Structures are given as C-alpha cells and as structure tokens.
Swiss-Prot record:
Function (record text): An essential GTPase which binds GTP, GDP and possibly (p)ppGpp with moderate affinity, with high nucleotide exchange rates and a fairly low GTP hydrolysis rate. Plays a role in control of the cell cycle, stress response, ribosome biogenesis and in those bacteria that undergo differentiation, in morphogenesis control.
Assigned EC number: 3.6.5.-
UniProt-recorded Gene Ontology molecular function terms: GTP binding; GTPase activity; magnesium ion binding
Protein name per Swiss-Prot or TrEMBL: GTPase Obg
GO CC annotation: cytoplasm
Domain OCT: 359-437
Record lineage: Bacteria, Bacillati, Actinomycetota, Actinomycetes, Mycobacteriales
Cofactor(s) needed: Mg(2+)
Origin: domain of life: Bacteria
HAMAP family reported in the protein's UniProt record: GTPase_Obg
Amino acid sequence: MPRFVDRVVIHARAGNGGNGCASVHREKFKPLGGPDGGNGGRGGSIVLVVDPQVHTLLDFHFHPHVVAPSGKQGAGSNRDGAAGADLEVRVPDGTVVLDEEGRVLADLVGAGTRFEAAAGGRGGLGNAALASRSRRAPGFALLGEKGQVRELTLELKTVADVGLIGFPSAGKSSLVSTISAAKPKIADYPFTTLVPNLGVVSAGDHTFTVADVPGLIPGASEGRGLGLEFLRHIERCAVLVHVVDCATMEPGRDPISDIEALEAELAAYRPTLQGDSTLGDLAERPRAVVLNKIDVPDARELADFVRDEVAERFGWPVFEVSTVAREGLRPFIFALWDMVRTYREAQPPVVPRRPIIRPIAVDETGFSVHPDGQGGFVVRGTRPERWINQTDFDNDEAVGYLGDRLARLGVEEELLRLGARPGCAVTIGDMTFDWEPQTPAGVDVQMSGRGTDTRLEQTDRVSAAERKIARRERRQSTDEPGGEE
C-alpha cells in the first residue's frame, strides 16, 4: 500500500441549493393571508485548507470523490431552508491545484491558506420573495441552483529552502540525516529513497529546511524512471545542491559529467509553476556542489583532484563532505544559510491584504444571441442560463415568469432584431424550446397576476373568479324546478 502520494485527481461536487417553497398563509379569519413560502438554503462549498499536520495526498488516493451537503428546501410560514455546511478538506502545505486542462488554479502555501474548489449552488426564492404589486400571490417558487462539479488535479510540491539532487546512492539521505533530525530510510542499493524527506537544519540561531529528493537519472525530464515525480519537488527550492558520490565512480563517469547530466535534465524540465517570479527558472537558482564520501581514501583523492576544476567550470561553491566522519559539515551548513538568507532578503516584504468589506460588483446583465446554423438561435449569458435552471417547467405560471424576465432583459428584442421567426428553436443552457414572441420590440412587459398569463393559450389553474362562477351555476341548477331535491 502506498504511504506517500503526491499527485491525485479528485472529483469535487458542491452541494445543490434548496428549492424555494410556494405556500399561502392560513389563519382563522384571514382568508387572504398572502404568500409565506421560504427560500431554499445555500448548498455547501468545497474548500481546500492547508494543514501543517498533513504531509501526503494519500487520503484522496482511496477516496477521490468529495461531496458537500446540499441546502434544504424552504417551508411555509416564511421558514428558510437550512444552508449546507461547507466541506473543508485538509491538504498538505505546497499543494498545487490544476483544472482539467492543466491550468494552475491555486498554489496553496502556508498554514491556513484556503481555496474554494467548488462553489455551492444558491437556494431558490420562495413565493413570498417573488411577490410584487402586480403578482401578489405567486403560485410558484424558484428551484435551487446546482452545485459546481469539477475534476481537479492536486500536486504536492515539497516546500523547502534547499533541495539535494544527485544520482541514486549519492548519499543524499545520509547527508540530510546528519545535518538535521530527519530519519530517512538509508541502504546500500539504488533508489532507496522513494519519497522526499524534509529536515530542519540549524545554523547558529537560524534555521532552514532541506529536502532530500529521490535520485535522478538521465532522461528524468522525459519521465524516465520516476523523474517527473522527483523533479516536481524541487520547483520551490531556492537553492539546489549537487551531491556527488566520489567513492563509487563507474567507468565513463566523473563528478563533472554527473553534474552536467543533471543540469541537462533540469534545463529540459518544464515546471508547473512557471509564473513564480520569486524563484525564477530552475537554471537561474543558486547552486552548490558537495563531493561526498571523502572518508574513503580514493574518494578523497578524487575530490581534491576535481574540486578546483568544478569550481572553475561552474562557478559554484564546492564542499568536501563525509557524513560518516562528520567532516566538512559545519562550513557547508553555514554556507547554505548564507545562500538562503540572501534569497530571503531579496524577497519583497509581505503586505497583508486588506479585507474586502464590499465585494466587487460583477456585471451579469450581458448576454449574447447567435444563430446555431440550423435556423435556430443560441442564447448565452449568466442570467439567462441561471434563470433556466431555476424554473419549474411543470408550472405554467413559473414559465410565464421566466418569459417576463427574459423579455425585460432584452432577449426577445434581440431575437427579433436578428430575424427570429415564431416557432424557431431557441436554446438557453440545456433547454431548447419553440419561441413564440408575445410583444413587439420596444414594448414594456407588464407582470401578470396570479394564475393568469396572456401568453398561455390554456392553463390548468382555476382562478378564484372561475370557482365563484362555478358555485353560482351549481346553486342555480339546484334552485330550478325539477332540480335536485
């Protein structure tokens, strides 16, 4: 069973908004109590929250479906439905959120950082909220909006100041375990380290973090071995350290060729966070070289021989280190701290964001109408599509209310301007219907009363006046001679 997972695909489904309620107030001696249907509750959203106690995406590996609760339906007596609780999902520090097309949506760094992965749907209005002077007792309510459904990719990128890179069995894990309290798995065979290991290093009164990245091989930037997974974890490192094994050199290999091979892989790798200007490109970040395992006599001789050549060729500081004899570690640690401190001092000061008391207004009144190439038209826009989803098409009065809203927005006038004819197919969102214009362009649309809509040829709703006439006719029929006794 995997214990460390750094890339998962999750299916986030936010909660749906609750439907509004259509009800009439009933009380003794109050025959015209008026509408009292409550609004539906808001659906719960899915929020990703950085938790320092979480270090892997393992939970999502077994449970990729994340579902937030939906809002409750409104009720009579002006009772609003309960809102669905937001679902807070804990993720590790350094998690990057990508959409289905690979675009970066969020870079979650720092404890408590939040990102709304999927927004909950808004609750539908009850008939009490829909009442107006011309529609005093609406016989319908609006449906709740569907919650947002998204497929997101989560990638964990290690957050460390220094990244140790090198070929397998170069001694990176031994080095990080010696200069910090980290206890990675150490063995004398390649690819012992399969997951990044983090360690906190003390340099006097200062501390910084070091990441032991699993071994790299030529072709890692193209996915050979586990290269792409390994290279992902050095994107955030401000300083990169080449760890070279001077004790077990193979024929045709030397420290300089090893460094050049790894640099070629770093140059070919295209990080996900290409827009992170604070760190810059991988090729621009400061480097250092560690000639490791100098406790072996042949390794010390090789390190002394190539040290000046490496420094002259690459222009980076070079350190001869032995983790077994704990030789050369102190100057190496303080040199790393100087490089990390230089990076930190170059960063712009963090300016706290001012809280937004009044959110920025978003213009949702815009819409567009385009021919579909088959004699029909397609209407696109935030409001029209939302209104379609909120309409109960089994209720004639709700359909009439939708027509009023679309006409007031100008959709009908725009269709007439583009040459739409009665009976042509009009598509809004997921709904396609035959369009029948009821008002000429430029005429204000008057809201219809309860149970009546001039655009409907027939309605199954019986008005109060019709019921009164029916009762009068029944009484007259019983009073006539020969009627029921």
